[in-house]
């Protein structure tokens, strides 16, 4: 008699579990918010990112643009083309060397990651004219900026104005001729 009662309880439990299982949405957290791990609350930009910009998402989850030429222009495959696009995007480099800008480069569309570490060999250098970031949510990594004095004036090699969530990581900025 006791075995029948235990069996009946087990069957009832299984039926109840099978009935309730579809009601719980997939991916639903069973932990209250205050018990969730720090990882689920705060996703950092990249391993080792620190400081106020560490949660910048850049182009995460967006389109990937490949820089396939060192030329400066608005044709597909150039850095300028990739930076002029809108929406979340990551720029990777299939070439290494120096991109000699024909004019200043203004980054005005945010949600952007420029992954200089993706370049082969010695990486990428941006030269001749300044680069200015005027957009939110931008990550720039592993690039060299060498503006020099070819373009005239006293430019900064890399600058930013009126932007939030900006990370400049492992970049070298030199040969600027401003405010000496």
Regions found by a protein language model. Give the residues of each.
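Bacterial N-terminal signal peptides that target proteins for export
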Residues: 2-14
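Bacterial N-terminal signal peptides
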Residues: 13-23
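Boundary at the C-terminal end of the N-terminal hydrophobic targeting segment
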Residues: 26-28, 32
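Acidic Gly/Asp/Thr-rich repetitive segments characteristic of extracellular carbohydrate-active
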Residues: 35, 44-91
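Acidic glycine-/aspartate-rich tracts in secreted/extracellular proteins
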Residues: 71-72, 96-98, 118-121
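Extracellular beta-strand-rich solenoid/capping regions of secreted or surface-exposed proteins
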Residues: 79-87, 99-115, 122-141, 147-164
């Amino acid at each position: 008699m006791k075995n029948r009662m235990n069996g009946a309880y087990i069957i009832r439990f299984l039926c109840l579990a099978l009935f309730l299982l579809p009601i719980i949405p997939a991916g639903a957290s069973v932990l209250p918010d205050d018990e969730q791990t720090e990882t689920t609350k705060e996703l950092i930009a990249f391993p080792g990112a620190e400081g106020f910009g560490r949660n910048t998402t850049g182009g995460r989850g967006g389109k990937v643009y490949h820089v396939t030429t060192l030329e400066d222009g608005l044709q597909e495959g150039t850095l300028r083309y990739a930076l002029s696009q809108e929406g979340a995007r990551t720029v990777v480099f299939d070439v290494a060397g120096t991109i000699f800008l024909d004019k200043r480069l203004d980054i005005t569309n945010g949600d952007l990651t420029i992954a200089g570490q993706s370049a082969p060999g010695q990486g990428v250098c941006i030269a001749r004219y300044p680069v200015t970031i005027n957009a939110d949510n931008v990550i720039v990594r592993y690039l060299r900026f060498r503006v020099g004095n070819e373009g005239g004036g006293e430019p900064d090699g890399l600058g930013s104005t009126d932007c939030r969530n900006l990370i400049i990581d492992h970049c070298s900025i030199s040969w600027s001729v401003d405010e000496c």
